[in-house]
Amino acid sequence: MPCRPTMTTPWEAAPPLPAMPRPATPQRSMSMLHHVGHAAPVSADRAPLLRRLSTDQQSTEKPLLREFSVDVEETFQRLLEQEDTDGDMQISISDRGPKSITLKTVKGTTAEVRGTYMLASLLQELAIAKDRGERHMVIREAQLAEDPIHRLSRMIRTMFWDNLTRRIDAEGLEKVLLDPKNRSSHRRQLLYVPENEPDMLAYYRRVAQERPDLKLDVEALPTHFTPEYVRDLNQRPGLLAIAMEKQVDELTGAVDMKGIPFVVPGARFNELYNWDSYFIALGLLEDGRLDLAKGPVDHFVFEIEHYHKIMNGNRSYYLLRSQPPFLTDFTRRVYARLVADEPSRDHKPWLKRALCAAIKEYRTVWMSEPRWDPATGLSRYHPEGLGVPPETEASHFTNLLRPYAEKYRCSVNEFTRMYDHGQVHEPELDEYFRHDRAVRESGHDTSYRVERRCANLATIDLQALLYKYEVDIAELIRDEFDDDLDGEHSAVWFERAAFRQRQVDTYLWNEGKGLYFDYDLC
């Protein structure tokens, strides 16, 4: 029989993989007949690996040291017409073009750029220049031959983070209000602000008056809201306000407000997300962007205080739904970097506020019914809600709902309206959407592992995350607050972690398979 393992968490290091044999001479695709050596570095600390190179029969310039002088629009169109044979606005190995283009160098000669990768890099550089409104540009050949991993990392660091950064204030509202998921007929933009934040309400109403182009309506959100209230908001979905900071004008002394920046996932997801933000922050901290990594922690504290949970995202249709909990580890990582980067400042007040918010979230969200199961002491994903989730694409539930629409002899849209407002009762459909909401809260959407049963499952990942919460809280109270945080003591939290481990071993451990499995509470 296998030994009974102790409960592990995702943060514990896995054993190292065995070293793989490495080829003596790396093979690279070249269009040169002679050895050209390594590429010139794109930056001082990131030298690119060689890619497929360009050729030039009219110049003695060394490859990768050349610079091309190009007309942005003309070259962009010529490159697409010649190389993008499948019309997807990209250049890939699927395209059937000649994989070669001739460009002028800054010295007046011509050079041929060859190969899928270099042409794709050229297209990307031209697209970036077009977005910036540039008509002419100089491109270094080294940019086009840059190692793809270095290139991607550099572009994330220098472009993508900033392009995906949002702020909910006068300067940032136009960009962040956009919601591709909004299928309502309401054409004006809506911003919901907690009713107990009068300064924020006044600020946003002033912005709405001063910026009629935003077509913005600002509404106060009550302190407490029911599933019925949130369902009715789905007819007028909007953005939910999050944390702001007050700023004082040094010249006039006037007090104004500014949104705290955060990074969005992008595409259809143009708002602050819960566990997305944690993993985004890991990259931000790696790239030295503490300013952007800290913001979501402040926003999550605000959400717990005003919306009673860290929401799936800060749109009105997410008001009742959370996501996998990462706040304690998130806080620890940011706090450690704050202390390292600004050792002369006292960061304990910030840590205390975040830790107290995490304790509140732990108790009121994950250790309260319906998410908490009193019989086992374990927790599950189980958000409240009524009706069909409105943020999905229009046809997402069509096949599911069509038989019900036929039963009531109406269109799918009409049946959805009746079902959402309780005019028809379908227990099987209620059960389906109970689990569907839980799947979305779990972050596992979509997965056959949890499909149609998620609200019944004490999943191993959620137990591990809450175990991490309990240990994190205990260690921070002990190490940072002399074992007393407003009456909270580490021993109690360590015991909670030990209890969870015992319950997980009891209910989720499969002795025969030697693995932990989700436990069906029903």
Language-model-detected regions and their locations in the chain:
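Acidic, mature catalytic/reactive cores of soluble proteins
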Residues: 1-522
